[in-house]
């Protein structure tokens, strides 16, 4: 199991938190998602054999937020 923290821009409310947690949490291989709205960070625990950091970032960007590269 790996853990990664992504810097995410554009989140401003609890709806944003729920959207990111749901979209990332539905990915196969993701075991935990925690969004820190104030810091603009998303902590993800995942199985790198099943899902990549790019897949996780894409899921966040699909919700309309920007992931720092």
UniProtKB/Swiss-Prot annotation:
It comes from Bacillus subtilis (strain 168). It comes from the Bacteria. CDD domains: HMA. The keyword Nuclease does not apply. GO terms for molecular function: copper ion binding. Pfam families: HMA (PF00403). Its main location: cytoplasm. Keywords: Chaperone, Copper, Cytoplasm, Metal-binding. This is Copper chaperone CopZ. Induction: By Cu(2+). It is found in: Cytoplasm. Monomer in the absence of copper. Homodimer in the presence of copper ions. Forms a heterodimer (electrostatic interactions) with CopA during the transfer of Cu(+). One of its GO terms (biological process) is copper ion transport. The copZA operon is activated by CueR and indirectly repressed by YfmP. The keyword Metal-binding applies. One of its GO terms (cellular component) is cytoplasm. Residues 2-68 form the HMA domain. The gene is copZ.
């Amino acid at each position: 199991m790996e853990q990664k923290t992504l810097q995410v821009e554009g989140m401003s409310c609890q709806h944003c938190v729920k959207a990111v947690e749901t979209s990332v949490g539905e990915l196969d291989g993701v075991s935990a998602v925690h969004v820190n709205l104030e810091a603009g960070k998303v902590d993800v625990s995942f199985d790198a054999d099943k899902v990549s950091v790019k897949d996780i970032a894409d899921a966040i960007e699909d919700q309309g937020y920007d992931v720092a590269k």
